[in-house]
């Protein structure tokens, strides 16, 4: 896991170095836009020891600001930052001895975060019309609330599961996020963006030392969102 984290961080740093270097030789732009975004999260948690899970849905939404700095041949380059509310967590999947779903028991944990992604924005297409874009960069978050639901369990069974009733120990979260989508951009109506994005947490929300219950406890989230932006400066 340490090797994976190092590789991901190195890749992001290289992108960060290459991005401003490209900006020095491209056709300059000074487009600044702000707007709103909203969508859904499909959530899972990477646990070691492994826990069978489904992918519960949560909501995400917030504010977006984007600055387009230059156009390098066919590629439009810029930077984007967001301030989002995001529902994450996990839902456990239980099975009977014959492999079918056990509907008599359930457990889920909902975790609400304020997320701030810092993204390199790369788009391909004309200045106005349809563009394909890629967003990639680091993300930080802070837990602002959590809740859990359980049914079909005895007190002894709940006590035997390490994650049940266990409060989140690390409220600060960080990782890498990236994705792509389509943008429809017009001169008068602003920009409409449809995006799919994946978040891979590099931090753990439980302590993960040898003496602790888990070796890994990190978020993994797929987001599908719509964004509307209007230009403050073209």
Predicted regions and their residues:
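Hydrophobic, well-structured mid-protein blocks that either form specific transmembrane helices
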Residues: 96-138
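Extracellular/periplasm-exposed beta-strand and loop segments of Gram-negative cell-envelope proteins
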Residues: 44-55, 88-112, 143-173, 204-221
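Predominantly the C-terminal beta-signal and adjacent terminal strand-loop region
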Residues: 29, 88, 173, 178, ...
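Cleavable N-terminal export/targeting peptides
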Residues: 1-29, 231-234
